[in-house]
Amino acid sequence: MQTSDRDLSGPEASPSGMPEVLSECPPAPTKSAAFDLFNLVLSYKRLEIYLEPLKDAGDGVRYLLRWQMPLCSLLTCLGLNILFLTLNEGAWYSMGALMISVPALLGYLQEVCRGQLPESELMRRKYHSIRQEDLQRVRLSRVHLSRPEAVAEVKSFLIQLEAFLARLCYTCESAYRVLHWENPVVSSQFYGALLGMVCMLYLLPLCWVLALLNSTLFLGNGDFFRVVCEYRACLQRRMNPRQEECACESSALQGAGGRGLLDSSPAPTPTEDLTPGSVEEAEEAEPDEEFKDAIEETHLVVLEDEEGTPCPAEDELTLQDNGFLSKNEVLRSKVSRLTERLRKRYPTNNFGNCAGCAATFSVLKKRRSCSNCGNSFCSRCCSFKVPRSSMGATAPEAQRETVCVCASCNQTLSK
């Protein structure tokens, strides 16, 4: 105590020295506000809920401008143009006052009616509203959320923030490109549109400017032209249903022709092709019963052997060059000549021997001709069945129908 009294009685304790000591002391550090990232997420979610009506209004405007429902978009465009062109200045002021007073009146009535509701009804409205529940969950989420859930909420917010900033940066970069004339075409269009709007505002009344702007927004986008093209195609289909049927049939025929070309063998055909595939195609191309019977009587489809005399090309050239013969007549002539050759080469009697086992043909042992090589065999030696498509037939039925061949031809065709 003595020492303290002595110190106080010294020259340092003079009243004139006290302010100097106080002024020399450093100020106490103020406590800085801590940054809480989860509070930022909470505020963002609340703001998102409060701004939802504006988001819904924007979605409705985009829905109309994209012509998702063409009738509503057309009626909206026409209605706005009529309003812009018919309302005068007084009507516009009246409409503005109405747009301000109606929401105010609705909010006031809602608040007045809410005060008269019982407590149970207020609680029911509070806890059965989806958005109120979401807001309540957001407010209480910090207390009940675990650490992983909180981290997930923060990550979701950061992802949305990054996407928003990326869009904003892209918009700013696009604006700078236009202002710095990096793309002369876009910049000239932008400045030309601005000059055109200034001229329109100077030359035309405001109502006409608004009507032109509204028509440009509705009728100048790509969705409007898409809807017009769809309706035009639908109208053409209704006006010409036969054309559509013909187009479907032609597409089906083209598809069948493409499959036939894929199934056909690449081997070149001679001037007059007597292969089994060509004979079957001729039968399918000409459904005349007379020529079908002529082919079915023989039950044979043969190839030209090496020592056989080929058909002279003059007949084929004559048939092709003669303009008075139709395609059906050409096919009839080819089938008739083929049938006659088969009848001359393979008689209908059962005399002779089997080329495989040398057995004599009789009433009990019928002769059978190989559909590939054309030689005569007994029923035992010519009992192998192969599909007609393996011999070059390109018809769709050739994949299912089978013909009888000998053992050697079966080995050759099976490879």
Curated annotation (Swiss-Prot):
Region of interest: Necessary for interaction with VAPA: 290-296
UniProt region (Necessary for interaction with RAB11A and function in neurite outgrowth), positions on chain: 51-64
Region (Disordered): 1-24, 254-290
CDD domains given in the database record: FYVE_protrudin (cd15723)
Entry binding sites for Zn(2+) 2: 370, 373, 406, 409
Zn-finger segments (FYVE-type): 348-414
BP GO terms, sorted: endoplasmic reticulum tubular network formation; neuron projection development; neurotrophin TRK receptor signaling pathway; positive regulation of axon extension; protein localization to plasma membrane; vesicle-mediated transport
Tissue specificity note: Astrocytes express both isoform 1 and isoform 2 and oligodendrocytes express only isoform 2 (at protein level). Isoform 1 is expressed specifically in the central nervous system and selectively in neuronal cells. Isoform 2 is expressed in cerebrum, cerebellum, spinal cord, heart, thymus, spleen, intestine and lung.
Superkingdom in the source lineage: Eukaryota
Name the record gives this protein: Protrudin
Species for this entry: Mus musculus
Gene that produces this protein: Zfyve27
